[in-house]
Amino acid sequence: VLEENVVALGDVVVVGYGIQKKESLTGAIGNLKVDDIVKTKAPSLAQAIQGKVAGLRIRQENGEPGKFSSNINVRGFGTPLFVIDGVVRDGSSEFQRLNPEDIESISFLKDATASIYGMNSANGAVIVTTKKGATGKPRITLNANVGITSPTNVPEMANARQYMTMRNEAEINAGRPAYITKDELTKWQQGAPGYESVDLYDAVFNKHATQFQTTLSLEGGTDKVSYYGSFGYATDNSLLKNNALTYDKYTFRSNVSLKITKDLTASINLGGRYDTTNRPWFPFYDIFKSTRVNPPTTSIYANDNPDYYNNFSYVPNPAAMIDADYTGSAKERNKNLQTQFALEYNIPYVKGLKVKGTFIYDYNNYGYKATRKGFKTYTYGEYTGEYTAADANYPALLQDNRRESERVDMQFQTNYNRTFGNHTIGATYVFERREEKANWMNGERKFDFFTIGELDNARESDQKVSGSSEHQAYLSHIGRLTYDYKGKYLAELACRYDGSYRYAPGSRWAFFPSASVGWRISEESFIKDNFKFVDNLKLRFSAGRSGQDAGDPFQYFSGYTLNSGGYVFSQGNY
């Protein structure tokens, strides 16, 4: 059972469905406390803990605001299972969006100890415990920080003088006439009016981007009630000018524990998040690519007139690409609510025996709306004095995608822990039932003439609509036995019996056992008496079975697939 006392977490480590003393661990478990987590300030929790746990590998694959796509693995394997406050959550993206100021500890199960989570534990497990209140006067804390980011290295590109010189040399070396005359080359080299070098990167990107995070929290408690609450805000800006790409996140958390009677304790944990990402229609990579591909002799505006974006020969004008009002934009938003209600009862007259029931309800609402606007770029005729328009992104397009999901998880847990002289034994049994539902719908329409970004204002012909729903269900029985003799000799046996909706009725259940032993050599007299500088030396061994809930569901049903195209007749497909 996860204890509500924050102080107790100082010398214990959160493991699957419980806590254990550090010195009693028999598995490979890394642990980070709150001070280690918040020491590094970053928009993503993954970046904040990078490099702080042995065997934990985190590779940031995308620095774009709102893209929580860091690759997280334990000991080089695949993505681990993520457990937040005792509940299996939606994976790496949700973990990375957590407010670091709300976290008390993170445990990393690296070996067979992860088997207690059964299916989907093949790559280890990451267990997050959020802050709980502690006895004491109310404490109000305000944390705020501002960060500045900049590219590690930006490739240096040729300017107009260098570019034209190399173009001329390339043509001459190939036995062809020079690309431009000597007089024109001199003008490019001197930067004469109309022959200025254009740095497209500087025209589109700032040298630095800003980040801001703040959290206001309140915590405290008495012998009857303990509480922790917080509100957080974070923003992450990109290098793009005009604030074309931004991410904003609002979070709240409320963890309250109430001692109803001497033996009965209730807890209510609430967590919520609302975050939005605003970006141009064009992907960040395409914008960056445009600043690299187009030559430095092409100006942003035709005839240097800011009313006319210049028409580029290779890829679209990057300045037009980041102008959301002109070329289109996209907005992504998430609404997430996590609720957890628990009752814990210490059984009278049976010392060390307690039972706990937990009900979890999570809700997530996702929306994505993107508008591609048709736009024009121009070429200026020096002799005619006229602007010739070229169309791009026609016809205009609107995409509107929605997804709604909910999770219901019920856990019943029995714990027994008792010390008899030099012997300490522990036993845990958990029954868990988890159910998840989701539905989604995607719509797309094109415009004959763009007015406002709503599907009803676009044409009905050539529209695309898709959608579906899913229903998942899981049952689990979990057991664990621990033994400790004099704090020297340690043993643990654990097992999980998992059932998944994904497979055929006769093959839905799987058994995941694990065993581990430990020997605290530092507690032996021959170490204590001769090597006083050794305070904790342990030899341990673990083995277990883990799995992966892989594959599409209901593949055991017979089905058929028609060949593409043609018609279906009574005798077959033609």
Predicted features, each with a name:
Residues F284, S299-Y301, T379-Y380, E492:
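Core alpha/beta catalytic barrel or barrel-like domain that forms the active/cofactor pocket
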Residues R279:
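Glycine-rich, Lys/Arg-enriched anion-binding loops that position phosphate/diphosphate groups
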Residues V1-R253, T265-S267:
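Short, small/polar-rich motifs associated with maturation and membrane association
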Residues A174-V198, Q213, D286-A320:
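Acidic, glycine-rich flexible loop segments
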Residues I37, F212, N255-L264, N269-Y274, ...:
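Extracellular/periplasmic, surface-exposed regions of secreted and cell-surface proteins
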